[in-house]
Amino acid sequence: MSAYAFVNYVRFKTQADAYTGTPYQNFSINEQRVYDGITYSFAPFAISSGGGARGGERSSASLVAGTDAISVNLFAEAVRERYMLEIKTVSLDPLTFTDEALVASEIWRVASYDMDTTRVVLKLTSPLDAVDRKSVV
């Protein structure tokens, strides 16, 4: 039987392409992980990738976290400031949990957020969704 382990590293970017806030990872509980020279703090979140109709490419995704003041305020700021979200999914050695290989690197545009009493969902869309098709030559 094969064992697999993955971690998601996430960072928000401003419209000026500058990283902002705290980078987060969702694998090592109450610990920090360093990836590519950047220190990521733990946050309990999940990434949900949606399917899209644009040539088979995904055009939406979401980042889901528990409803707490930090998540709600961060997601509200990300929507208000029109942040982008960088997500790096990395495979881990299943015995040592050290980073092995970059599986995916994605940039998403923050679109909106929804919340209820247990979770807050940050809705993400393709960065290309911000481009008006008529203006593309």
Question: Where are the language model's segments positioned?
Answer:
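Polar/acidic, low-complexity leader/linker segments enriched in S/T/G and N/D
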Residues: 1-42
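Surface-exposed, interaction-prone regions used to assemble/regulate multi-protein complexes
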Residues: 7, 25, 30, 62, ...
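Short, acidic/charged, Gly/Pro-enriched secondary-structure junctions
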Residues: 7-18, 70-112
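N-terminal, Lys/Arg-enriched amphipathic/low-complexity engagement segments
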Residues: 33-55, 60
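Short, solvent-exposed secondary-structure boundary/capping segments
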Residues: 56, 112-127
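Charged, amphipathic alpha-helical segments
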Residues: 59-75
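Solvent-exposed coil/turn segments that connect beta secondary-structure elements
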Residues: 66-68, 90, 115, 127-129
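Conserved small/polar residues in nucleotide/adenosyl-binding loops
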Residues: 136
